[in-house]
Amino acid sequence: MTAPSLSLRHAAPYSTVNSLGFPKPPAQTRVVVAMSGGVDSSVVAAMLAAQGYDVIGVTLQLYDHGAALAKKGACCAGQDIHDARRVAERIGFPHYVLDYENKFRESVIEEFADAYLAGATPVPCIRCNERVKFRDLLQTARELDADCMATGHYIRRLMGPKGAELHMAADPARDQSYFLFSTTQEQLDFLRFPLGGLASKAETRALAAQYGLAVADKPDSQDICFVPNGDYASVIEKLRPGAADPGEIVDMDGNVLGSHRGVIHYTIGQRRGLGIGGLGDPLYVVRLEPDTRRVVVGPKQALATKIVPVTEVNWLGDEPFEDEIAVTARIRSTRPPRPAILRVTGKHRAEIELLDPEEGVSPGQACVFYATEGSRVLGGGWISHRRGG
């Protein structure tokens, strides 16, 4: 893969800063745009090209075979690659497709399967951003002599007194900060998120129509590209044949209430589909025990969690990661941040004390930290287990 000519990139000093924060004209600023084939990243590419930037589009082929190929809304499947290429051709900038299937499988899919078998509920989209898009693709952007890489994520990169900061999107309904907590400071310095300040997705689609993009009305992509029809269990059984052993459904005292087909079919907080109806008060999955192949159920109040231990903490705050600090914390992508205390318990380890207990805290999910005032993302980590309160 050869980068386009650099002849415009070494000219006389520029007297102002362009919209991406560089002290040179847009024509001398090379931007690699990570294009999924959806409307968001397509608008980013078209917008930057319209502003005169030296745009290069790159699409990753992550998972493009079997059932996923036929799945509508699968990120970076065959149709999406075609759509990204059409946008590049219409606007007039180079576009490359990189085969990342092996890297994606090794870095994301294998861990996804192992996590479910261990009784966790993983978030593969975060791992994909962390291990593929913001690591390998970002390195490719550097090799193309890019000044920065832009994506279609709804999150903001704002300059603070000590450098670039990560902030929630202007549109709370579209905010993707939960999925980007593991972005490092070095990566943040190189990344740009042009859509983070838009008030709504309607604005994005209006821009797509304005630029004449065929994807203007394309439906939003699904979160997990390699899980056809949301059937996690069938994917895991294909990856790990025979690993999903049946077992017992028990109450919190160990009394057997029924049987199950494998812990991979259950998540913390699940109520429906347990097959143990007619027992009086509703029962919820409160714990998964893969070693004993038990699914433990209990009343709703047993889901209340106050202390949330987290590992692999990525810290983006200005002050050193030590002692304790008041934050707000989000324990699921669909939950708003809640007041909490963050306590450091070791290198890259911490615990969150929620001021009000939350239900549905699940190992394998992310816990993201925010400043108590404003919209700044301070970092986050992975929930290792749960403790009641």
Swiss-Prot record:
GO molecular function: ATP binding; tRNA binding; tRNA-uridine 2-sulfurtransferase activity
Main location: cytoplasm
UniProt-annotated stretches for the region Interaction with tRNA: 174-176
Subcellular location: Cytoplasm
Residues that, per the record, bind ATP: A34, M35, S36, G37, G38, V39, D40, S41, L60, G152
Reaction catalysed by this enzyme: S-sulfanyl-L-cysteinyl-[protein] + uridine(34) in tRNA + AH2 + ATP = 2-thiouridine(34) in tRNA + L-cysteinyl-[protein] + A + AMP + diphosphate + H(+)
Disulphide bonds in the chain: C128-C225
Active site: C128, C225
EC assignment: 2.8.1.13
Keywords: ATP-binding, Cytoplasm, Disulfide bond, Nucleotide-binding, RNA-binding, Transferase, tRNA processing, tRNA-binding
Enzyme class, spelled out: transferase
Pfam family, one: tRNA_Me_trans_C
Biological process per Gene Ontology, one example term: tRNA wobble position uridine thiolation
InterPro entries for the chain: MnmA-like, MnmA-like_C, MnmA-like_central, MnmA-like_central_sf, Rossmann-like_a/b/a_fold
Site positions (Interaction with tRNA): H153, Q365
PANTHER family: MITOCHONDRIAL TRNA-SPECIFIC 2-THIOURIDYLASE 1 (PTHR11933:SF5), TRNA 5-METHYLAMINOMETHYL-2-THIOURIDYLATE -METHYLTRANSFERASE (PTHR11933)
Role description: Catalyzes the 2-thiolation of uridine at the wobble position (U34) of tRNA, leading to the formation of s(2)U34.
Family: Belongs to the MnmA/TRMU family.
The protein, known as: tRNA-specific 2-thiouridylase MnmA
Native species: Paracoccus denitrificans (strain Pd 1222)
